[in-house]
């Protein structure tokens, strides 16, 4: 991507993902040089160009995977998690892939985009955005992007403070309406 630094304000960015949610847009710089398989997976699912074997968040067998998905787990001061088409925390695309850890990417600041998983090599479609430093996650979750502007960070913060039930699920759904990649 030409001159991506001026677009994303991140020297690591290879593309930008904009999550259009019912609470506002979240712009994220994607780190394709540091986590190429993870970024390719996310972009492919977002655009509907990557095959998957489960129903997407809209209930279909093909097309953009994340459109209509909710942030199903929100923990104030920690993170917001989405990307599960079922909204339960147990769904995914029907496949798993390996972690990609890069020494330049550490959970040493908020607003990092990373893969949610159930242990080594179990990445699929679920992701989270941190709202604080989370060094205990280093080498456990693949970091593949960062929220890049103050307005997007405010949206993430607002989502992180939304009311939740006893299972950390927002009582008023936070919906990913669509994702655009540029």
UniProtKB/Swiss-Prot annotation:
It is found in: Cytoplasm. GO terms for molecular function: peptidyl-prolyl cis-trans isomerase activity. Belongs to the cyclophilin-type PPIase family. Residues 13-181 form the PPIase cyclophilin-type domain. One of its GO terms (cellular component) is extracellular region. Its main location: cytoplasm. Homodimer. Keywords: Cytoplasm, Isomerase, Rotamase. Its EC number is 5.2.1.8. One of its GO terms (biological process) is protein folding. This is Peptidyl-prolyl cis-trans isomerase A. Pfam families: Pro_isomerase. It catalyses: [protein]-peptidylproline (omega=180) = [protein]-peptidylproline (omega=0). Gene3D superfamilies: Cyclophilin-like. PPIases accelerate the folding of proteins. It catalyzes the cis-trans isomerization of proline imidic peptide bonds in oligopeptides.
């Amino acid at each position: 991507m030409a001159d991506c630094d001026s677009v994303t304000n991140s020297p690591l960015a290879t593309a930008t993902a904009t999550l259009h949610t019912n609470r506002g847009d979240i712009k994220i710089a994607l780190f394709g040089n540091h986590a190429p398989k993870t970024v390719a997976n996310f972009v492919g699912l977002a655009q509907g160009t990557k095959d998957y074997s489960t129903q997407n968040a809209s209930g279909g067998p093909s097309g953009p995977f994340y459109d209509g998905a909710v942030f199903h787990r929100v923990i104030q001061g920690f993170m917001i998690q989405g990307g599960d088409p079922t909204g339960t925390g147990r769904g995914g695309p029907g496949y798993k892939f390996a972690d990609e850890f890069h020494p330049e990417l550490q959970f040493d600041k908020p607003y990092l985009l990373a893969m949610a998983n159930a242990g080594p090599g179990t990445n699929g479609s679920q992701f989270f955005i941190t709202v604080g430093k989370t060094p205990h996650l280093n080498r456990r979750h693949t970091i593949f992007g960062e929220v890049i502007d103050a307005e997007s960070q405010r949206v993430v913060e607002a989502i992180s403070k939304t009311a939740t039930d006893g299972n950390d699920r927002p009582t008023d759904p936070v919906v990913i309406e669509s994702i655009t990649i540029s």
